[in-house]
């Protein structure tokens, strides 16, 4: 058999620290959000199916609970996929892990009840998310709710009305 060797030149790599920012309305909380079960196999941690199936390690009955939110934020021009980890999920949903486990294990809907409650609490809310874009999804590192002043909204509506009257029908 042939022998191969690879030589690599030493190189310096700069790791980017720039944070992307998105502001807009949470228009969808996606399936796979809320309270989830993860594969307990060291180094895996994949989300399990409803039947506790890991795509790599098959059935896992000793799963580990976790929380996340996979959502869509729309800024009025473009919709962005965003992902919140456990800490930010607890922060913006107002639901901690113990509460989510209680809800998920006591409801006839199971873990879907946690998703339903998070959707009711969050859909339609305006947020400002900062994080890193990875594979067309913003991995959120910080989030805050955005509140608009009524006078600000009125001024924007007036400007929009003036634009329409100057430009004619849209």
Segments predicted by a language model, with ranges:
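Primarily single-stranded nucleic-acid-binding OB-fold modules
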Residues: 1-170
């Amino acid at each position: 058999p042939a022998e191969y060797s690879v030589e690599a030149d030493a190189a310096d790599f700069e790791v980017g620290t720039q944070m992307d920012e998105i502001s807009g309305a949470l228009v969808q909380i996606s399936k796979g959000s809320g309270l989830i079960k993860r594969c307990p196999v060291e180094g895996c941690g994949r989300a399990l199916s409803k039947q506790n199936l890991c795509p790599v390690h098959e059935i896992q009955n000793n799963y580990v609970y976790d929380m996340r939110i996979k959502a869509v934020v729309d800024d009025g021009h473009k919709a962005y996929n965003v992902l919140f980890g456990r800490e930010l999920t607890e922060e913006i949903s107002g639901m901690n892990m113990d509460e989510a486990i209680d809800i998920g294990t006591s409801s006839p809907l199971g873990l879907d009840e946690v998703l339903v409650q998070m959707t009711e609490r969050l859909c339609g809310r305006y947020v400002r998310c900062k994080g890193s874009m990875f594979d067309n999804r913003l991995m959120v590192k910080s989030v805050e709710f955005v509140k608009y002043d009524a006078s600000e909204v009125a001024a924007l509506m007036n400007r929009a009305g003036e634009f329409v009257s100057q430009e004619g029908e849209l």
